[in-house]
A protein has these predicted regions:
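Polytopic transmembrane helical bundles with strong interfacial aromatic enrichment
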Residues: 1-39
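Feature for soluble, non-membrane regions of globular proteins
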Residues: 44-237
């Protein structure tokens, strides 16, 4: 059985289920691109504007599990607003020259919220696919080693996502010691702030599912599983 650790923060709970983390190499570039996993090579410290990521699929391609209308609002409006707010907030500050992941790790207040939501949403959208392939063996083996089985992981992750009070994100991440971790984060929370490496996330803010599912978060999470790009998740190990 996985080792479970609960940490109380102020007025909300973040649930940890310890289940794997080499060195962190996710995002270290100022501009969002089509592949968040390749953003670690930029050493430029010049000021750049954050922009919407280009999606590797058409916005209608995930329907009916995720409709084009949901993408119009979730991707085209909500994410765009976070990006616009971030660009305004960091203009003329040291954050304007920082990679996005560095902003997430160092900032607080409004800068953190908008930077983290920009990072989180980009990561979420770029881990979806209309053509899901079987989970690669190395990921399945890691989950079996640390959680017991792939099914046990899905059950624990689903419970964390559906049970998260209010808005937030549920993550599969890697610890520095190599264990996989399920982290339930409220609001704009991101496991990079704890020294963890994100592998997978689901957005459980209401704007992620309300158009298609109204208040049926559990149904949204159930259908989201069919849209996960397991190869991308495995490549992050």
């Amino acid at each position: 059985a996985p080792y479970v650790l609960w940490i109380l923060f102020a007025t909300y709970l973040n649930g940890y289920i310890l289940v794997k983390n080499p060195d962190n190499k996710i995002v270290t570039q100022n501009v969002l691109t089509t592949n968040i996993d390749t953003l670690s090579n930029s050493k430029n410290r010049q000021t750049m504007k954050h922009t919407l990521p280009q999606l590797p699929y058409k916005t209608e391609a995930l329907a009916p599990k995720m409709s084009a209308e949901t993408f119009e609002y979730h991707y085209g409006k909500h994410l765009q607003t976070y990006i616009d707010n971030l660009n305004k907030l960091i203009e003329g500050t040291p954050y304007a020259e920082m990679p996005l992941d560095e902003i997430v790790r160092k900032a607080d207040g409004g800068v953190f919220n908008n930077a983290a939501q920009t990072w989180n949403h980009t990561f979420f959208f770029l881990t979806l696919t209309p053509d899901q392939q079987p989970m690669p063996e190395k990921l399945a083996a890691a989950l079996a080693r640390d959680v017991g089985s792939v099914e046990a992981f899905r059950e624990a992750f689903t419970k964390a996502a559906v049970g998260l009070f209010g808005s937030g994100w549920t993550w599969l991440a890697q610890q520095p010691d190599g264990k996989l971790v399920i982290v339930a984060e409220s609001n704009a929370g991101n496991p990079m702030t704890r020294g963890l490496k994100p592998l997978l996330t689901v957005d459980v803010w209401e704007h992620a599912y309300y158009i298609d599912y109204r208040n049926r978060r559990a149904e949204f999470v159930k259908n989201w599983w069919d849209l996960v790009d397991w190869q991308k998740v495995a490549d992050r190990l």
